[in-house]
């Protein structure tokens, strides 16, 4: 007896589109290539009209009563659908949570670097998790860490809004910032 294969070598079953002879409904509501309704026609008559125009009969809506078909060039239609799907994939941006870590005794330049990193993350549409790390007895100074995080939120006010206020989580204090949908308009004191 031959050994059993570890995986299925058959080609995956692809669902074929409902066009031309694959449409099994006897009555169809037909729309021509210009968008003009031809009314409810039987399937054979609709196929005949499509072949006269050298186009395909494509099932658009199966759930309608009777099902809706359109007379169009299926190759061109498929290409347009793939192009739209590709554009949609390109435009969709997965929001990630980026982290900026620091200690509560951070120097000015290091703080400016963290602000720059957070700004870059927010401009690219990602959320920012600001973390202040405590070591040893530093946890007693959580009020200084909270002040630092609030200062950071204030400095990033134009690009972000506070999603979660500073709170202690284990040996860290964290705060979440999310990018602003609309730019903040500052009021002038005049």
Swiss-Prot record:
Where does this protein chiefly localize? cytoplasm
Looking up InterPro entries in the UniProt record yields: T_IF-3_C_sf, T_IF-3_N_sf, Translation_initiation_fac3_CS, Translation_initiation_fac_3, Translation_initiation_fac_3_C, Translation_initiation_fac_3_N
Q: Which GO terms describe its biological process?
A: ribosome disassembly
Could you name the Gene Ontology cellular component terms for this entry?
cytosol; membrane
- Where does the protein end up? Cytoplasm
Alphabetically ordered keywords of this record: Cytoplasm, Initiation factor, Protein biosynthesis
Cited Gene3D superfamilies: Translation initiation factor 3 (IF-3), C-terminal domain, Translation initiation factor 3 (IF-3), N-terminal domain
GO MF, one annotated term: translation initiation factor activity
Tell me the subunit arrangement. Monomer.
Q: Which family does it belong to?
A: Belongs to the IF-3 family.
What functional role does this protein have?
IF-3 binds to the 30S ribosomal subunit and shifts the equilibrium between 70S ribosomes and their 50S and 30S subunits in favor of the free subunits, thus enhancing the availability of 30S subunits on which protein synthesis initiation begins.
Report the HAMAP family cross-referenced here.
IF_3
Indicate what this protein is called per its UniProt record.
Translation initiation factor IF-3
Q: Which organism is it from?
A: Prochlorococcus marinus (strain MIT 9301)
Q: Which gene encodes it?
A: infC
């Amino acid at each position: 007896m031959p050994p059993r294969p570890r995986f299925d070598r058959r080609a995956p079953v692809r669902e074929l589109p409902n066009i031309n002879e694959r449409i099994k409904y006897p009555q169809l509501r037909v729309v021509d290539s210009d968008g003009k309704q031809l009314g409810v026609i039987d399937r054979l008559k609709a196929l005949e009209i499509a072949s006269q125009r050298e186009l395909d009969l494509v099932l658009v809506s199966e759930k309608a009563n009777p099902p809706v078909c359109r007379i169009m060039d299926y190759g061109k239609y498929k290409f347009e659908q793939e192009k739209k799907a590709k554009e949609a994939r390109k435009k969709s941006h997965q929001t990630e949570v980026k982290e900026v870590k620091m200690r509560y005794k951070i120097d000015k330049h290091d703080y400016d670097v963290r602000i720059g990193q957070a700004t870059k993350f927010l401009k690219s549409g990602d959320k920012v998790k600001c973390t202040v790390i405590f070591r040893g007895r530093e946890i007693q100074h959580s009020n200084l860490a909270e002040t630092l995080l609030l200062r950071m939120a204030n400095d990033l006010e134009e690009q972000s809004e506070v999603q979660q206020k500073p709170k202690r989580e284990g040996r860290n204090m964290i705060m979440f910032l999310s990018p602003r949908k609309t730019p903040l308009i500052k009021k002038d004191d005049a």
